[in-house]
A protein has these predicted regions:
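Function-determining surface determinants
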Residues: 1-275
């Protein structure tokens, strides 16, 4: 199915919505519904900007986003959101002229994207096409490296969750953001999606360590959307059994607790649950 043409009106609307969220958050540490709304606005923006793929004002758009984000006084959230924008959508750092040369790349999705924007782009030389192929390959390699870095970041957060200067609630919040960021990294990069099975065990491991049911259901939904029914069904079955055992240690959740679960598939889950 062909991708829709770039809707600049929707893009402007999404940027405006994000700016409004940021403006209303000035002087406030984003929590609860406010942080959720903030993230929803970014996700809507992320759903539009990949269609720009490597240009059509991508650099200018990134500058606008950074300027808007700078209005927030929450350094933690600013850092999370800037990381999300600059790392999860690396195509925005490419030059516009490189997009047309993606015609030469054997990638169906790229081909469809370029079909929707090629009439806006100047012609490029054979040398530029060759350079793009090399840079595109390096970009994907760098993105895989960032995914591994994100998993290492989760490990560090888990290791530091009991430090004296950080509350359990704050640690859990940061972990959930990091895990969602990892999932988005897989979701928005088509190259990652084709090879996601190789990193799925690692991603599930971090979900298991966190033990956060709604995040796991989101991953089940994501798998179903990508037609990975076998993995989605297995994950759903394990999650159902996991939830059945939840009441056994539910009274301890207010302060957090260790858990050890044995699933029918033979998988053993253990970790520390944050409420």
């Amino acid at each position: 199915m062909a991708l829709p043409p770039i809707d600049m009106h929707s893009l402007v609307e999404a940027l405006h919505e994000l700016a409004q969220r940021l403006e209303s958050a000035q002087g406030v540490l984003l929590q609860g519904e406010a942080l959720h709304d903030y993230r929803v606005a970014l996700r809507r923006l992320a759903a539009i900007t990949p269609l720009l793929h490597a240009g059509i004002g991508g650099v200018e758009i990134m500058d606008i986003i950074k300027k808007e984000l700078s209005q927030s006084n929450s350094l933690r959230d600013q850092d999370v959101l800037l990381t999300y924008l600059t790392r999860q959508m690396p195509e925005l750092v490419c030059q516009a002229s490189m997009a047309q040369s993606a015609y030469q790349i054997s990638n169906k999705r790229l081909h469809l994207v370029i079909n929707s924007v090629v009439h806006w782009l100047p012609p490029v030389s054979k040398l530029e096409q060759s350079n793009f192929a090399v840079r595109y390959s390096l970009l994907q390699l760098r993105s895989w490296t960032l995914l591994r870095e994100r998993l290492m970041q989760l490990e560090r957060l888990l290791a530091g969750s009991s430090s004296a200067n950080e509350t359990v609630i704050k640690s859990a919040h940061r972990l959930r953001i990091a895990i969602k960021g990892t999932r988005y990294l897989l979701e928005w990069q088509e190259t990652f999606a084709r090879s996601a099975l190789s990193v799925w065990p690692e991603l599930r491991l971090w979900q298991d360590k966190l033990g956060y049911a709604s995040d796991r259901w989101m991953i089940v939904s994501w798998l179903q959307q990508h037609d990975w029914q076998e993995h989605a069904l297995r994950m759903g079955s394990e999650l159902t059994q996991w939830q059945r055992q939840l009441p056994e240690w539910l009274p301890s959740l207010r302060h957090g607790c260790n858990y050890q679960l044995q699933l029918s598939s033979g998988t053993s889950l253990s970790g520390y649950f944050f409420h």
